[in-house]
Amino acid sequence: MGQKVNPHGFRLGITTNHVSHWFADSNKAGQRYKDFVREDIKIRQLMSTGMERAGIAKVEIERTRDRVRVDIHTARPGIVIGRRGAEADRIRGELEKLTGKQVQLNILEVKNPEMEAQLVAQGIAEQLSSRVAFRRAMKKAMQSAQRAGAKGIRVQCSGRLGGAEMSRSEFYREGRVPLHTLRAQIDYGFFEAKTTFGRIGVKVWIYKGDVTAKELAQQAASAPSRGRAPRRDGDDRGPRRENSGPRRDGGNLRSQRNDRNENAAVEAAPAAAAVATEGSDA
């Protein structure tokens, strides 16, 4: 299962969190759940168009009744902000026009872009679009991630690799990438490279380590207890039953069986003695 499913969705609530924070409980047009989901998709599409070189790793959206907060995590904040904040003002104006609400735009810098799977996938895709050999681009990205502190990385490219007539998939892996371990912090990214031969999909998995024991203890403390409630009398298991009482079947079956065997032996003794006497007379 862990080999197929998206690592972010597989670990929601364990090592990853939602990137959209809002709650929809209205049936009014424009405030329904499907309206907010459609709006989130349009916001992320707006962030991706024309901002390919900004290195946007993640876009988080939070909603209140009359305001929308958008957090942009980028490796190159200067491109997103623009000269004297002109680009940021343009983005804020387009978002307010799209949502119809006041927009709070926060631009956050990614401290370690070599450890962000989405940024690594974008970097490989840019090299493939520039006609760099796919194996060289994959291995270079893996070496950079390991130098940055990654415990494991896997990179996969799918498409007409090298301009081949038949499409195929190739992947390389360094270190450990435990996709089945839920406590493992797996970062996942996907990006498409546009080449003259067609599109090449790039997938990146980066293993950053397990959740610490302190975090596990905090989660266990905050989780509700699922233990059995104590019994009404005695300890948790309650008092032991006494063996002296009558059984449900009316008595001890083993003692009844022994009594029947003894009675049968007493009744059979005279008959056996008579048979022995007749044999001696003959």
Swiss-Prot record:
- Could you tell me which SMART domains the record lists for this protein? KH (SM00322)
Q: Which GO terms describe its biological process?
A: translation
Q: Where is the composition biased (Basic and acidic residues)?
A: 230-262
PROSITE patterns per UniProt: KH_TYPE_2 (PS50823), RIBOSOMAL_S3 (PS00548)
Q: Which CDD domains match?
A: KH-II_30S_S3
**Which GO cellular component term is one of those annotated?**
cytosolic small ribosomal subunit
Q: Where is this region: Disordered?
A: 218-282
Q: What is this protein called?
A: Small ribosomal subunit protein uS3
Q: Which organism is it from?
A: Renibacterium salmoninarum (strain ATCC 33209 / DSM 20767 / JCM 11484 / NBRC 15589 / NCIMB 2235)
Taxonomic lineage: Bacteria, Bacillati, Actinomycetota, Actinomycetes, Micrococcales
Which gene does this sequence derive from? rpsC
